[in-house]
Swiss-Prot record:
This is Ferric nitrobindin-like protein. Pfam families: THAP4_heme-bd. Belongs to the nitrobindin family. SUPFAM superfamilies: Lipocalins. CDD domains: lipocalin_heme-bd-THAP4-like. A motif (GXWXGXG) lies at residues 20-26. It comes from the Bacteria. It comes from Streptomyces avermitilis (strain ATCC 31267 / DSM 46492 / JCM 5070 / NBRC 14893 / NCIMB 12804 / NRRL 8165 / MA-4680).
């Protein structure tokens, strides 16, 4: 279910499907890097201004699904305009800052992004650009990332399937929103 908070900036309504905390797992595979399964936690939040705040933490998983070590951390800010053009600024822990542009699909909650600019610190590894696809599918958030370096052409390197995380605060908010005249047996929901 996509919930649109009453204090969400009006320009961000098309991105409301991203809001919340997400967790799941995926696959990482790129030449010169360790191929592995990874766990991921993502949050998209807002404070009433015209952008979403984004945070992602990934970690390598062992064969039993246990956390082994951090893989990648990134954070950033996402905006969308009236023409459904999306811009994102993201910073990664490996010393890369990216500006992404793309668009929100016309009839489905899907975002295609492409890097417009990449800045790297001296500590960053080779990286020259990428693409990302985010989609809201059957109440889950799925994404795939592609990247390129001077040595490797653009290719997929990470993808994940994330589920919405329900917090105690969510349950409390939903409970407060229930109608006062709800029947004791709850059957009315199914009639």
């Amino acid at each position: 279910m996509i919930e649109i908070p009453s204090d969400l900036h009006k320009d961000l309504v098309p991105l409301a499907f991203l809001l919340g905390n997400w967790a799941g797992a995926g696959v990482h595979d790129f030449p010169g890097s360790e191929k592995c399964n990874f766990g991921q936690e993502v949050s998209f939040t807002h404070d009433g201004r015209d952008f979403l705040e984004y945070h992602s933490h990934t970690w390598v998983l062992d064969a039993d699904g246990n956390k082994v070590r951090p893989l990648e951390t990134e954070s950033g800010f996402w905006r969308v305009d009236a023409a459904r053009k999306v811009e994102a600024v993201m910073t990664r822990d490996d010393g890369v800052v990216e500006i992404w542009y793309g668009e929100l699909a016309a009839k489905k909650p899907q975002i295609d992004l492409v890097t417009d600019a990449v800045a790297r610190t001296a500590a960053a590894g080779p990286y020259s650009g990428g693409k990302r696809l985010y989609g809201y599918v059957k109440s889950d958030l799925m994404w795939v990332g592609e990247k390129q370096t001077p040595e490797v052409e653009l290719r997929p390197y990470m993808s994940a399937h994330l589920k919405k995380v329900v917090t105690p605060e969510d349950v409390e908010r939903w409970a407060k929103a229930l109608p006062d005249d709800m029947p004791d047996d709850g059957i009315a929901f199914f009639k």
